[in-house]
Design a protein with these regions (language model features):
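Secretory targeting and sorting signals
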Residues: 2-26
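Beta-strand-dominated extracellular/periplasmic modules and repeats
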Residues: 90-92
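Sequence/structural signature of beta-propeller modules
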Residues: 29-66
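Replace the tail clause
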Residues: 85
Length: 484
């Protein structure tokens, strides 16, 4: 799970750019709706990727359009930590005895902050016990928190290997549960998810793949924090939270930007694993996996025919999470510069499945895919958008094939779609806004460099953290753009 480098040099970017040559979801779970002023309604953005299926495509109006996006005003909020992840957002919640629209973020060293979406003030911060012992060290998290649908609580991860339930009103911890026995080796890198009263978390390792660690899926009771179940991608015959040293195999991180992806119809959990041994029995490195909603059973699996080569050359399949396209189709990228289109019914069951891809296409620039593609269902068509360090591209799904529609050489992190616009953060600096179906550039909003950060868009506002977790800084910036 070694992370290949990317340039972080800041660059000055114009506020508009030319168009380019040459596209959710049944998984959507929009938050509560209330009448408001910024758009037709006020809406929440409760998790990374908008919905449980991580489509990255908001179904809510935003009030931001191609006609007014260039006029947004930016505020830079100074934070006491770097947020190498995304924000989440709840509108009209009670914090400190008053009603606020609030962004919530978790820093790389585990502080979780509530930020007033109107003025950028810090409403509260939660600092986990032991913070001073790891702040400034290699021990980090890049996990985005998730909100409970009741809108009274959020769930956040820390470098100590704990998931915590925090009260929206004041930030106090309701419960705290460990999902690893060795946080010095096992990292919570991916965003948390929530479905049907359960919090879903995954674990990976740190840069350099220092053993021992095993990627695993942890299921927690959202009410009281009980660790209900663990599915281990190595030693998968052991359905418990294991001491990593007690398993003869190591690695197989679950570290993709989208983490655990949930089919909202069945509740099934999809994950992808990184470098590690694969034997098709109890070791599942470099594989795409479907688990039952409680993570007690494996329901389907796929690994490329060259899985041993992927492991040997550090070309993790699990550098990105599975993409649910609908119609039984799943897309799976990787560090080998390829995106594989899979008919998932051919991958059913516990018997091992190698190869049998419907199609293999290149990532936007043919390099590592570390980001979470976005999926847009228009009613008549399905589009997929992806960005890597060297480009951004859009495909349309036709006759079980991804057909390229546009492409450019501007790199980006995980794309999001909101209010009919496609937003892609360039980690060198700048938030690019596109027309999704044509790829025409609408504007570039000025901001600084980052790493895996990505934006959210709701209620006439955009929130985007800056900064790189691997700099080990204890300060950072949250950019908030607002309609004037």
């Amino acid at each position: 799970m070694k992370i290949r480098g990317r340039s972080l040099a800041a660059c000055a970017i114009a506020s508009a750019f030319l168009g380019f040559a040459t596209p959710s979801s049944r998984y959507a779970e929009p938050g509560p709706v209330r009448v408001g002023q910024a758009s037709d309604s006020l809406h929440d953005w409760m998790r990374f990727g908008w919905d449980v299926g991580r489509s990255g495509a908001s179904t809510a109006p935003t009030g931001i359009t191609a006609a007014n996006v260039a006029s947004l005003h930016r505020q830079q909020v100074q934070l006491d930590g770097t947020v190498d992840a995304s924000a989440i957002y709840l509108h009209a919640v009670r914090v400190g005895g008053a009603t606020h629209d609030v962004f919530f973020v978790t820093t790389t060293y585990g502080k979780t902050l509530a930020i007033d979406a109107d003025d950028g003030s810090i409403l509260w911060r939660y600092t986990p016990p032991g913070y001073d012992s790891w702040a400034g060290t290699y021990r980090i998290t890049t996990a985005t928190p998730v909100a409970d649908p009741d809108r009274h609580y959020i769930y956040a991860a820390g470098p100590d290997g704990y998931v915590r339930k925090l009260d929206v009103a004041d930030g106090h911890a309701v419960w705290s549960t460990a999902i690893t026995r060795l946080p010095q080796r096992e990292k919570i890198a991916s965003p948390l998810n929530w479905f049907r009263g359960r919090v879903i978390a995954t674990t990976g390792g740190y840069i350099g793949d220092r053993p021992p660690y095993q990627g695993h899926v942890a299921i927690l009771d959202a009410a009281d924090g009980t660790l209900l179940h663990v599915w281990n991608s190595l030693c998968s015959d052991r359905q418990e939270l294991i001491d990593p040293a007690s398993c003869s195999a190591s690695d197989s991180a679950i570290w993709g930007r989208a983490g655990a992806v949930v089919d909202s119809t069945t509740g099934d959990i999809f994950v992808a694993t990184g470098n590690g041994p694969w034997n098709g029995r109890d070791n599942w490195g470099d594989a795409t996996l479907e688990l039952s909603p409680d993570a007690t059973r494996m329901l389907g699996n796929y690994t490329p025919a060259n899985t041993d080569e992927l492991d040997r050359t550090d070309a993790d399949l699990g550098s990105t999470s599975p993409v649910l396209l609908g119609g039984g189709l799943v897309a799976q990228g990787g560090k080998d510069g390829k995106i594989r289109l899979l008919r998932w019914t051919q991958m059913d069951g516990t018997a091992p499945h190698k190869g049998r891809e419907l199609q293999v296409v290149s990532t936007p620039s043919g390099t590592d895919l570390f980001t979470a593609p976005a999926v847009l269902h228009t009613g008549t068509s399905t589009w997929m958008f992806a960005a890597d360090n060297g480009g951004t591209a859009g495909w349309i799904l036709q006759e079980d094939r991804l057909r390229p529609r546009w492409h450019n050489s501007d790199g980006g992190t995980s794309p999001v779609i909101a209010g009919g616009l496609l937003y892609v953060y360039d980690p060198r600096g700048g938030l690019r806004v596109y027309d999704p179906e044509s790829g025409r550039g609408v504007v570039v909003l000025l901001c600084g460099p980052g790493h895996w950060n990505s934006p959210i868009v709701a209620d006439g506002r955009i929130a985007l953290p800056e900064g790189n977790a691997n700099r080990h800084a204890t300060s950072g910036v949250l950019d908030i753009w607002r309609l004037k």
